Regions:
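A short, basic/aromatic alpha-helical/loop segment that forms part
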Residues: 19, 121-122, 148-152
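Flexible "cap/lid" loop of the alpha/beta hydrolase fold
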Residues: 7-41
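Active-site catalytic pocket residues across diverse enzymes, especially alpha/beta-hydrolases
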Residues: 3-4
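Conserved loop-alpha-helix segment in the C-terminal half of the alpha/beta-hydrolase fold
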Residues: 107-145
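Catalytic active-site module of serine/aspartate enzymes centered on a nucleophile-bearing elbow/loop
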Residues: 135-175
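Short aromatic-enriched loop/helix-cap "lid" or pocket-rim segments at secondary-structure transitions
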Residues: 21-26, 126-128, 152-154
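Conserved alpha/beta-hydrolase catalytic His-Asp/Glu region
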Residues: 21-25, 45-106
Length: 175
């Protein structure tokens, strides 16, 4: 929003903050503090960052089996310096923005496309109301997918993005 003139449109892939209770979920500071405690935080991370655990989490986000190259990539990136802090923040909810719907989504003036389907980590119950209030919003369901349509159904995803980005700008979005 701060760079509004530099942005013509925005595509969101399986975004959080659109479930019916998204505004109620707050980061759990106590959980983050407990998980980050030096005595066991590395051991907890080591458990989360095994190939078996990574594959399990990716299986939840894929309609089919995740590509082994993605498992390998995820494993390698999880073992970079400082990487152990990201999963701890994710598990405790610190990566969520509980007010993103009001503070960001409701304020967007440019064309917005939401690509979604089933997602084990978030819901989309608030999406129809958001689209009703904001004609600059549109949604495309990419089926069958579970949170990562750009991996599960890349052709459908890219076609939807191309169609969206190639739409002529409306009079409303130009002003």
């Amino acid at each position: 929003m701060e760079r509004g003139p530099n942005v013509r449109s925005l595509a969101l892939i399986s975004p959080t903050g659109l479930s019916k209770d998204a505004q109620e979920r707050q980061p759990n500071e106590g959980l983050h503090k407990a998980l980050s405690f030096p005595l066991w935080s590395q051991a907890f991370f080591d458990l989360l960052a095994t190939r078996v655990s990574i594959r399990r989490f990716l299986n939840m986000s894929f309609q089919g089996e995740p590509d082994e190259r993605l498992v390998d990539y995820s494993y390698k990136t999880a073992h970079q310096p400082g990487a152990r802090f990201a999963p701890l923040a994710f598990v405790s909810g610190k990566l969520n923005s509980p007010d993103i719907r009001e503070s960001i989504y409701e304020q967007l003036q440019h064309p917005v496309l939401v690509l979604y389907d089933e997602d084990p980590y978030t819901g989309f119950e608030a999406l129809p109301g958001l689209m009703e209030r904001h004609p600059n919003w549109q949604a495309k369901r990419i089926v069958p997918t579970r949170g990562l349509p750009h991996f599960d159904q890349p052709e459908q995803t890219f076609q939807a993005l191309d169609a969206f980005w190639n739409e002529p700008p409306s009079d409303e979005s130009e002003s």
